[in-house]
Amino acid sequence: MHLAALHTPSQIQLNQQGNLKHFLTIEGLSKETLTKILDTAQSFINDQNQLITTPLLEGRTVMNLFFENSTRTRTTFEAAAKRLSANVLNIDIARSSTSKGETLRDTLWNLEAMAADIFVVRHSSSGAAHFIAKDVCPHVAIINAGDGRHAHPTQAMLDMLTIRRETKKPFEELSVAIIGDIKHSRVARSNIAALQTLGCNDIRVIAPNTLLPVGFKEYGDHVRLFNKMDDGVKDCDVIIALRIQNERIDSPALSSQAEFYRMYGLNQERLALAKPDCIVMHPGPMNRGVEIDSSIADGPQSVILHQVTNGIAVRMAVLALSMQGQLQEQGLIEAIAV
């Protein structure tokens, strides 16, 4: 499926009052909605930069449904739900009834009947979360934890929170470079959408033509393409390195990993071309010596581990807001409490 065809109308994600009830994609959401997610996430981090625990989802059940392998995303969603005092169930998809021929629809209906309040879904098929929210379980809050090459909205929002907290600059004043496998990366797609919605006017995509998607110009007027790394990172405030998505590539996009590192690897010489206070980010997992040098990943400008902490806060925000949006939609509460 061409990604341009995966349009998610805002009314699927928002309730009648305009509040989040599902979180499926960045595209179609307003700056106000994204800012509310960021502000709510920030409220879950105290003055000592520690995550708080709150009873906002006490008595609610969050089910993690990961049809693709994950370490960080699944674990941080579990940590986020527990900090909201929710019950968390991690469904073993490999041993579920879907492996015995049961349809996805029937599996989800059975899980919904077990009093699930929120499904956190990762799936290899683009549009899976949209399908579940629209056609299967509209009264369960659906959080997209990554669907194929399409979207990874919570990763984008934790990246936006990291950028906001670390640079302390308005998005309108930032130059952001995204380096690597843009073609196969749902993170790149979601980050570009979030940056544009929040007002960033200088988004630089640095990649060989073989790692750029068809219809790249559809990403917007504020996105510029650079095939040469040195030109792209010059005077940047933020650099986001992406790994090559080998599991989604049918044929090799480059001759070797060594060739990619030579042309697009982030090393000390290239980082020196950016602004002195430039921050370095990576969604993980990292391939050291391919897209990023260890001296950069572990260096003073790296905020990679901060992204992980911010990820828990953002996922707390999305879980809380979408649950309350669902309750508001069903007339069970009048106003959002966070």
UniProtKB/Swiss-Prot annotation:
Secretion signal, residue range per the UniProt entry: none
Recorded name of the encoding gene:
pyrB
Q: Which family does it belong to?
A: Belongs to the aspartate/ornithine carbamoyltransferase superfamily. ATCase family.
Gene Ontology cellular-component terms for this entry are: cytosol
Q: Subunit arrangement?
A: Heterododecamer (2C3:3R2) of six catalytic PyrB chains organized as two trimers (C3), and six regulatory PyrI chains organized as three dimers (R2).
UniProt KW keywords: Pyrimidine biosynthesis, Transferase
Indicate the transmembrane segments per the record. Answer: none
Q: Where does L-aspartate bind?
A: 100, 186, 243
Function, please? Catalyzes the condensation of carbamoyl phosphate and aspartate to form carbamoyl aspartate and inorganic phosphate, the committed step in the de novo pyrimidine nucleotide biosynthesis pathway.
Give the PANTHER family listed for this entry.
ASPARTATE CARBAMOYLTRANSFERASE, ORNITHINE CARBAMOYLTRANSFERASE, MITOCHONDRIAL
| UniProt xrefs under InterPro entries | Asp/Orn_carbamoyltranf_P-bd (IPR006132), Asp/Orn_carbamoylTrfase (IPR006130), Asp/Orn_carbamoylTrfase_sf (IPR036901), Asp_carbamoyltransf (IPR002082), Asp_carbamoyltransf_Asp/Orn-bd (IPR006131)
The broad enzyme category this protein falls into is: transferase
Gene Ontology terms describing biological process: 'de novo' pyrimidine nucleobase biosynthetic process; 'de novo' UMP biosynthetic process; amino acid metabolic process
Give the organism the record lists: Acinetobacter baylyi (strain ATCC 33305 / BD413 / ADP1)
- Provide the E.C. number(s) assigned to this enzyme: 2.1.3.2
Q: Supply the HAMAP family for this chain.
A: Asp_carb_tr (MF_00001)
Q: From which lineage does this chain's organism come? A: Bacteria, Pseudomonadati, Pseudomonadota, Gammaproteobacteria, Moraxellales
- Pathway involvement of the protein, from the record: Pyrimidine metabolism; UMP biosynthesis via de novo pathway; (S)-dihydroorotate from bicarbonate: step 2/3
Catalyzes what? carbamoyl phosphate + L-aspartate = N-carbamoyl-L-aspartate + phosphate + H(+)
State the NCBIfam families in the record.
Answer: asp_carb_tr (TIGR00670), PRK00856.1 (NF002032)
Question: What's an example of a GO molecular-function annotation for this chain?
Answer: amino acid binding
PROSITE patterns associated with the record: CARBAMOYLTRANSFERASE (PS00097)
A single Pfam family it belongs to is OTCace_N
Name of the protein in question: Aspartate carbamoyltransferase catalytic subunit
Q: Where does carbamoyl phosphate bind?
A: 72-73, 122, 152, 155, 284-285
